[in-house]
Amino acid sequence: MDKDLLKIGFIFIAVVSGLIVFSKFSKSSWPAPQQFVACNRIPDFSSYPVSQVYPGKIRSVDLESNTMAKEMSAQILASTGSAVNFGGNYYLVSGNMCGQSCDRHAIIDVKTGQILLYGLDTTGGVEIRRDSHLIKTNPTGRDPTRYYDFKDNKLLYLCEEPK
């Protein structure tokens, strides 16, 4: 009987410890919409231009700059040597880290190798441009299409279109 209680105690401690660790690393640095804001006018990439596109490539990625992103380290490290694909001097990397029909995304500063943002989950991918700081999430898929403005290393939720 005492051994059974001891086993139950260890299991309880393991579960609680796992929940605490999981809650620390599952948080996202991406802003969730505070409330549904319908798009009065659909944002277009040309309305969010960058002044120039950085010509260099990622020399190395600093995984310590965002510890939450370590769960996607293989995909992030594979981006070494990549050129800008978004917002003038950023590289947006995607990985299937959140389920069968879900992708998780991170934004890396190509100049510094720092992981600026991590944890945006989408079911319909993202649409980005090298010369624009607009991010369009879920252009396909079941979830609403959301629009974000990524400027000065900050992400601002703009609006969304229901499906």
Question: Where on the chain are the PLM-derived regions?
Answer:
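Acidic/hydrophobic-patterned starts of short beta strands in beta-sheet-rich repeat architectures
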Residues: 89-92, 133-135
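Short aromatic loop motif centered on NTY/YTY
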Residues: 118-163
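Positively charged n-region of N-terminal signal peptides that target proteins for export
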Residues: 1-7
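Hydrophobic membrane-insertion alpha-helices, especially the h-region
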Residues: 9-21
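Structural signature of eukaryotic scaffold interfaces centered on beta-propeller domains
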Residues: 79-85, 127-129
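Short glycine/acidic-enriched loop and turn motifs that connect beta-strands
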Residues: 97-100, 141-142
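Terminal domain-start segments
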Residues: 20-82
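Surface-exposed loop/turn elements that mediate protein-protein interactions on large endomembrane-trafficking
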Residues: 53-67, 106-118, 146-160
